[in-house]
């Protein structure tokens, strides 16, 4: 996989998928490749993600960059000047209501790489992802196997409890990723009502 050829200055790339699919692992890989090319990279993480204060995947892989600057923020507009940065990498992009700010950075000839969930626990796309999608020059979908049946491709994020808060950060203690068959035969019955 030579992703670097697709990552051009002035472009926005988007990686989507369900939870536990490897989106953050993919971002870490991109950061290491960009650093190898001596690009100055900033990694932006939402303060809404309260799971972990480090840059770590659900599987335990941790980001140990050489020169990457790591910023935690609630809004992208609070990040400040990125004049000396070549690439902006954003994890959990769906957490940023002002994700459209990435267009400004792309206009400044920065490489923008975003990763976010394909849908909420209600199986609806997050508004920030919907707004930025038309400006993405490259989109990658990363899937995973259903955590319930282990047979089919999973694309649905299902919350294990009845909390209806849209943004509720957590891992496998709060969420399961499942296929369509398990969603309709198991989880919809348990978690009524999921509206399409």
From Swiss-Prot:
Its EC number is 2.7.1.21. One of its GO terms (molecular function) is ATP binding. Zn(2+) binds at residues 146, 149, 179, 182. Keywords: ATP-binding, DNA synthesis, Kinase, Metal-binding, Nucleotide-binding, Transferase, Virulence, Zinc. SUPFAM superfamilies: P-loop containing nucleoside triphosphate hydrolases (SSF52540). It catalyses: thymidine + ATP = dTMP + ADP + H(+). It is an enzyme of class 2 (transferase). It comes from the Viruses. One of its GO terms (biological process) is DNA biosynthetic process. The active site is at residue 92. ATP binds at residues 17-24. Substrate binds at residues 121, 166-170. InterPro entries: P-loop_NTPase, Thymidine_kinase, Thymidine_kinase_CS. Phosphorylates thymidine. ASFV replicates in the cytoplasm of infected cells and contains genes encoding a number of enzymes needed for DNA synthesis, including thymidine kinase. Important for growth in swine macrophages in vitro and is a virus virulence factor in swine. Belongs to the thymidine kinase family. This is Thymidine kinase. It comes from African swine fever virus (isolate Warthog/Namibia/Wart80/1980) (ASFV).
């Amino acid at each position: 996989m030579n992703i670097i050829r697709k990552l051009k200055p002035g472009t926005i790339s988007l990686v989507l998928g369900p939870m536990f699919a490897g989106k953050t692992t993919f971002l870490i890989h991109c950061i290491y490749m960009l650093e190898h090319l001596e690009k100055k990279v900033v990694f932006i993480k939402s303060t809404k993600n309260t799971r972990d204060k480090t840059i770590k995947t659900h599987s335990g892989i941790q980001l140990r960059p050489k020169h990457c600057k790591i910023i935690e923020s609630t809004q992208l507009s609070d990040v400040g000047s990125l004049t000396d940065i070549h690439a902006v990498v954003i994890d959990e992009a769906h957490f940023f209501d002002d994700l459209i700010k990435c267009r400004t950075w792309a206009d400044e000839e920065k490489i923008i790489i975003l990763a976010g969930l394909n849908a909420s626990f209600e199986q609806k796309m997050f508004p920030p992802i919907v707004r930025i999608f038309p400006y993405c020059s490259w989109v990658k979908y990363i899937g995973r196997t259903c955590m319930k049946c282990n047979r089919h491709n999973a694309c649905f994020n299902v919350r294990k409890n009845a909390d209806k808060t849209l943004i509720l950060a957590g891992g496998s203690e709060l969420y399961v990723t499942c296929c369509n068959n398990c969603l309709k035969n198991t989880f919809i019955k348990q978690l009524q009502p999921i509206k399409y």
